[in-house]
Swiss-Prot record:
The keyword Metal-binding applies. Residues 330-341 have a biased composition (Acidic residues). Zn(2+) 4 binds at H177, C192, C193, C209. The lineage of its organism: Eukaryota, Metazoa, Chordata, Craniata, Vertebrata. Residues 5-64, 155-214 form the CHORD domain. This is Cysteine and histidine-rich domain-containing protein 1.
């Protein structure tokens, strides 16, 4: 009878009588997720794609393990205080933002746009140099681009642990997860079947919920539009917007604007794209504004046209007239006409 191996990175079934000392290739370490990179603590290979992470070959050989690891016990948190006894540490104050000065005439948002001057920091130049493909990576990409599928190639479908063993593998039914992996508050599960667990090995060994064909090659998704965390602060003469996009590509990124509108287009980490258009709260001088591109973020330094404090970064859209008030006015006019008749 075949048994399931619970070594990390294996997930294969094995015969207990044929379990030799080097039958299993696995990871003795733990999974590491940091700054969008995924890998194992026992080896140095890192990737941003979850399917590639699951297909990273083990770095240690040993016998298969049939013992399922115990799930971690969550500590029970008790409190002796009632909710009503908890008081806020600080008094609450409501601060009203200053209103824009009425004397300033706002330029038209349809003014011509100009590209803001950009400066590339030494840290970004150094980071981009490190990210250049080595000869080994270039060879791997060339192999992936070829039509030939090599023996031992892992299926790229999520949750499938099968490898290519010949033409017969194409006729097999692939059991995989059509959704995406979700890690939230210590729980791990696939969005397509919602079977939650706190143990990473149990998550990896969950059988797929969808039947289909094996996917031996990674699909080319092209550039992916993603959100970026950003914030802003101001001085007496400048507004500084910080966009936290790592390793941006200067040749493919630009920021353009006029006196009241800013258009941001950034390509970072090779294949990620961030776009945003902001209708600014105040007025700027684009000719004296600039973009500082660094390894960990991008700073857009906007020169204020007037030395005044901005209540917020963006200008709220003008609210359209309420339709209900218009309907009431029409109804009142109709009632007056009826009374005259």
């Amino acid at each position: 009878m075949s048994l399931m191996c619970y070594n990390k990175g294996c997930g294969q079934r094995f015969d207990l009588e044929k379990n030799s000392d080097d039958a299993c290739t696995y990871h003795p370490g733990v999974p590491v997720f940091h700054d969008a990179l995924k890998g194992w603590s026992c080896c140095k290979r890192r990737t941003t794609d979850f399917s590639d992470f699951l297909s990273i070959a083990g770095c240690t050989k040993g016998p298969h393990n049939q013992e399922k690891p115990a799930e971690p016990v969550k500590p029970e948190v008790k409190s002796s205080l009632d909710k009503n006894d908890v008081k806020p540490k600080y008094d609450e104050f409501i601060i009203q933002a200053p209103k824009p000065l009425e004397s300033i005439q706002r330029p038209s948002p349809d003014e011509p746009f100009s590209i803001l001057q950009s400066k590339i920091s030494p840290s970004l130049k150094q980071a981009l140099e490190k990210l250049k493909l080595t000869e080994e990576n270039a060879h791997e990409i060339k192999e992936e681009d070829s039509d030939e599928i090599k023996i031992g190639t892992s299926c790229k479908n999520g949750g499938c642990c099968k490898t290519f063993a010949g033409q017969a593998s194409d006729d097999e039914t692939c059991l995989y997860h059509a959704g995406v992996p979700i890690f939230h508050e210590g729980m791990k599960y696939w969005s397509c079947c919602k079977r939650k667990t706190s143990d990473f090995n149990t998550f990896l060994s969950q059988e797929g919920c969808t039947r289909g064909k094996h996917q031996w090659k990674k699909k080319d998704a092209g550039k992916k539009v993603v959100p970026c965390r950003f914030d802003w602060h101001q001085t007496g003469s400048q507004v500084i917007i910080s966009i936290y996009a790592k390793n941006s590509v200067p040749e493919l990124s630009l920021v353009e604007g006029n006196s009241t509108v800013l258009k941001i287009h950034i390509i970072f980490e090779g294949e990620k794209e961030f776009e945003k258009q902001i209708s600014l709260w105040g007025v700027i001088d684009p000719s004296k504004s600039l973009v500082n591109m660094m390894a960990t973020k991008i700073e857009i330094v906007l020169k204020k046209a007037e030395p005044m404090s901005w209540a917020r970064l963006d200008l709220p859209p003008v609210a359209p007239p309420k339709e209900k008030e218009k309907e009431k006015d029409v109804d009142s006019e109709d009632e007056c006409d009826d009374d005259e008749d």
